[in-house]
């Protein structure tokens, strides 16, 4: 993280800066980095990846910064992240997350084909969206939803993800 982030800070606008920033964010998955260094980098260069956004949210919260909740909700809704970070973020945000936040996360997880995280997320989705999410998860996992006894919701035919998965898109 330090190598990439230091280079980006020293040479802002360097060609392919976005790739360097993404590599810095990916390094957070492998390295322990001081919270103040994480927040200093992301304060100047907002996260480009959802795992980076999630790490930023946790660092903000640990430092008691007011924007932690807003960044955390955006990360929650944004899709996949490291399992340990997911658990920490959920513990931090559970009191403020709304059904729409959980449904948005599930949609992002399904689009990213993050099956294991999507299966965990099923516990939190709204009852009205659950069947549609189960159908989409089945399609991602290569299972026929009808064989599992799941009805195909009429509004699902208009959703681009399931239509594409069925080969009709």
Place the predicted regions along the sequence by residue.
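Alpha-helical solenoid repeat scaffolds
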Residues: 1-169
């Amino acid at each position: 993280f330090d190598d990439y982030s230091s280079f980006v800070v020293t040479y802002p606008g360097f060609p392919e800066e976005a790739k360097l920033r993404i590599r810095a964010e990916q390094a957070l998955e492998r390295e322990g980095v001081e919270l103040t260094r994480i927040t200093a980098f992301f304060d100047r260069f907002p996260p480009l990846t959802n795992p980076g956004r999630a790490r930023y949210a946790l660092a903000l919260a640990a430092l008691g910064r007011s924007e932690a909740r807003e960044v955390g909700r955006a990360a929650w809704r944004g899709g996949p992240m490291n399992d340990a970070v997911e658990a920490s973020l959920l513990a931090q945000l559970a009191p403020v997350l709304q059904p729409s936040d959980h449904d948005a996360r599930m949609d992002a997880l399904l689009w990213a084909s993050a099956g294991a995280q999507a299966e965990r997320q099923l516990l939190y989705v709204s009852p009205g969206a659950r069947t549609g999410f189960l159908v989409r998860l089945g399609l991602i996992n290569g299972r026929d939803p009808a064989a599992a006894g799941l009805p195909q919701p009429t509004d699902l035919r208009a959703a681009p993800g399931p239509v594409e998965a069925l080969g009709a898109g």
